[in-house]
UniProtKB/Swiss-Prot annotation:
Official protein name in the record: Malate dehydrogenase
GO molecular function, one term: L-malate dehydrogenase (NAD+) activity
Subunit structure: Homodimer.
UniProt source species: Moritella japonica
Family, similarity comment: Belongs to the LDH/MDH superfamily. MDH type 1 family.
Highest taxon, organism lineage: Bacteria
PANTHER family in the cross-refs: MALATE AND LACTATE DEHYDROGENASE, MALATE DEHYDROGENASE, MITOCHONDRIAL
Sites where the protein binds substrate: R81, R87, N119, R153
InterPro entries the UniProt entry points to: L-lactate/malate_DH (IPR001557), Lactate/malate_DH_C (IPR022383), Lactate/malate_DH_N (IPR001236), Lactate_DH/Glyco_Ohase_4_C (IPR015955), Malate_DH_AS (IPR001252), Malate_DH_type1 (IPR010097), Malate_DH_type1_bac (IPR023958), NAD(P)-bd_dom_sf (IPR036291)
Classification of source organism: Bacteria, Pseudomonadati, Pseudomonadota, Gammaproteobacteria, Alteromonadales
GO CC field: cytoplasm
Binding sites annotated in the UniProt record for NAD(+): G7, A8, A9, G10, G11, I12, G13, D34, N94, I117, T118, N119, M227
Length: 312
């Protein structure tokens, strides 16, 4: 199993690479790529960690060598948010980066599963899809927007609020991956009751948690370490599913035939070909149903923006 990380020299990429080096199954290959000259050195640094995962690093303008034979490609390349920016401010820079890297994946590893971390995910995933379609290699089962950070934040905040073990907390998160498009389904957390006030406080905290980190870092970065952990959780789940482990479910932003939008995050059963089955997200509370309906205009506009970017 070969996993490639594109954008591996950045804050998310390095955290993700560390977790993959220590947690990928024995015999896996890990390939790191970034335009930054430091990238081969990041690989050398990680190579000193004693695990049965081989690692190589590549720098420069062409990721081809990193992508040859890749089964999974995780893309975190791009610029990060700074105070005062929202995810849409990132669009002009990151859209072009994703377009180029998706094109390289189409050319070098057309059968790989691709997980997009680069924001704005609501838009960068449709960009990748359009590029893959133009190349004639699009398989909607193999393209994912990694929204796992919204899930782990939800689990953490619920655990803290209710004083319960994280082992007992599962929170499905549907919709998209920015602001009001992030919808944690708190009504579905088993064994936990929330007051209307708790839901009204917790939901926006989850939606705006990225801004909380950006502001706390005072211009020194965005959520890199927690995002690295979230991407590793998703990537490792995907690897296990590709290797035949059954029953692995993660929430992710996919082209899954949703009645709401072309791309929509919801629980997905992963399998040997990527998406095995898009699962129903169950019954919503009145608050959640209203929030879902209210987000759709923004989510659809984000998707259209990506499609039109590739169409030119």
């Amino acid at each position: 199993m070969k996993v490639a990380v594109l954008g591996a020299a950045g804050g998310i990429g390095q955290a993700l690479a560390l977790l993959l080096k220590t947690q990928l199954p024995a015999g896996s290959e890990l390939s790191l790529y970034d335009i930054a000259a430091v990238t081969p050195g990041v690989a050398v640094d990680l190579s000193h960690i004693p695990t049965d995962v081989t690692i190589a690093g590549f720098a420069g303008t062409d990721p081809t060598d990193a992508l040859v034979g890749a089964d999974v490609v995780l893309i975190s390349a791009g610029v990060a948010r700074k105070p005062g920016m929202d995810r849409s401010d990132l669009f002009n820079i990151n859209a072009g980066i994703i377009k180029n890297l998706a094109g390289k994946c189409a050319e070098v590893c057309p059968n790989a599963c691709i997980g997009i971390i680069t924001n704005p995910v609501n838009t960068t995933v449709p960009i990748a899809a359009e590029v893959l379609k133009q190349a004639g290699v699009y398989d909607k089962r193999k393209l994912f927007g990694i929204t796992t950070l919204d899930v782990i934040r939800s689990e953490t905040f619920v655990s803290e609020l209710k004083g319960i073990s994280l082992a007992d907390v599962e929170v499905p998160v549907i919709g998209g991956h920015s602001g009001v498009t992030i919808l944690p389904l708190l009504s579905q957390v088993k064994g936990v009751e929330f007051t209307a006030e708790e839901i009204a406080t917790l939901t926006p905290r989850i939606q705006n948690a990225g801004t909380e980190v950006v502001e706390a870092k005072a211009g020194g970065g965005s959520a890199t370490l927690s995002m690295g952990q979230a991407a590793a959780r998703f990537g490792l789940s995907l690897v296990r599913a590709l290797q035949g482990e059954e029953g692995i479910v993660e929430c992710t932003y996919v082209d899954g035939g949703s009645e709401h939008a072309t791309f929509f995050a919801q629980p997905v059963l992963l399998g040997k070909n990527g998406v095995e089955e898009v699962l129903a997200y169950g019954e919503l509370s009145e608050f959640e149903a209203n929030a879902r309906d209210a987000m759709l205009e923004e989510l659809k506009a984000n998707i259209t923006l990506g499609e039109e970017f590739v169409a030119g």
